[in-house]
Every structure is written in C-alpha cells, then in structure tokens.
Amino acid sequence: MSILLLGKDGQVGWQLQRSLAPHGEVIACGRSECDLTDLDRLRSLVRQLKPAVIVNASAYTAVDRAESEPELAMRINGEAPGVLAEEVARLGALLIHYSTDYVYDGCKTEPYLESDPTNPQSVYGRTKLAGEDAIRASGAKSVIFRTSWVFGARGGNFVKTILRLAREKEALNVVTDQIGSPTSAAMIAISSSSYTNEPP
C-alpha cells in the first residue's frame, strides 16, 4: 500500500515517517517537494502517485502572522485540504488530516468534545475550520484530528521553551489565561498510523 505523507519535516511529520513505515511504502514530501500553495501541482502529484492513504501533516501554523497573511493561510489550511479530499474521494482512498483546537472559541471551561459547536476567533482558526469543512463536503473517507499544544523531540514547541527557560531563569512569567492539552507528536503519529489498517 502506498502512503503519501505531506509535511514530513514538522514535529508530527517526522514521527509519522517512523510510525507509517511498517504499514506500506511511505512517500514523504516536505515543502520543497510539494508546495501546498500550488493547488494544480498538488492535484497532479496525487493523480500521479495514486496513494491508498494521504496523511496531511502540512499546514500554515503561524497563528499570529495569519492575521496579516489571511489569503496564504487560507490557501494552505483551507483550500489545499479540499483539493486533497476531492482526489481522495476520486481514488477511493483515505485522508488523515490534522486540525486544531483553534476552531473553538476558547470560552468553555471543560474539555471540548468533537460535537461542540465551532466558533473560531482568529484567521488561523477560520482557515483550519475551512479545511475541515472542505474535507467533509467532499465525501472522502477521512479522519480529522484536532490537536493542541503539540510537542515532540524535533522542532520548537511550548514544552521545550518552558524547559529551556526553567534552566536559564530563576523565575518564570507565564500566561495563566490559556488552557490546552499538551499532545505528544509520537502519540499523534501512532494513533494516525492505526487508521491505515482499518480505514473508517
């Protein structure tokens, strides 16, 4: 079985290369091999490779910068997943996609459920929700993971930053108005790879 992995160089993508390998031939692409802003090239790549599974770990993740680059964020987070989903539906394949807790408004005091209403408050959140909506509208077989506070051995993340600051400073000043669920990139990758055995 062939598995197309997009976003191979990120925290989750790096782990996915390892967890997906036992499940088939992994064709791993980074930004240089697959630019998600070029939707025609993206479509051509999928048509050429005809994978049984596409794992989209690629995204525009600069939450604050998305406010000044809304078109670019929408292209990568909203439109590219839609193109992938259309091609997956055409192939009868499976799409595994990663979204975010930013699709919610952050007002709830308990953990969010998948069934809770979405209400993104940022450009980033709106673009990620647009990607989810495009996937669902395509009718493609898909799994969407809403992740938050991802950490891993590779790349920068909140956990690494706090550990570094704890070594460097006597006292830390950290915001107290944010709630999240730190999620291991390795756990995300292992959970994702299990879907290649039994598609939904």
Task: Go through each PLM region and give its residues.
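N-terminal Rossmann NAD(P)H-binding glycine-rich loop of SDR-like oxidoreductase domains
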Residues: 2-20
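SDR active-site strand-loop-helix element
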Residues: 6, 29, 54-58, 95-100, ...
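Rossmann-fold NAD(P)-dependent oxidoreductase module
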Residues: 15, 19, 87, 134
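Hydrophobic "lid"/C-terminal helical patch
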Residues: 16, 46, 192-196
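Adenosine-cofactor binding site in Rossmann-like domains, unifying the SAM/SAH pocket
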Residues: 21-44
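NAD(P)H-binding glycine-rich loop region in Rossmannoid oxidoreductase-like domains
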Residues: 39-78
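Catalytic helix-loop patch of NAD(P)-dependent Rossmann-fold dehydrogenases
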Residues: 68, 75, 80-83, 90, ...
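NAD(P)-dependent short-chain dehydrogenase/reductase
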Residues: 133-194
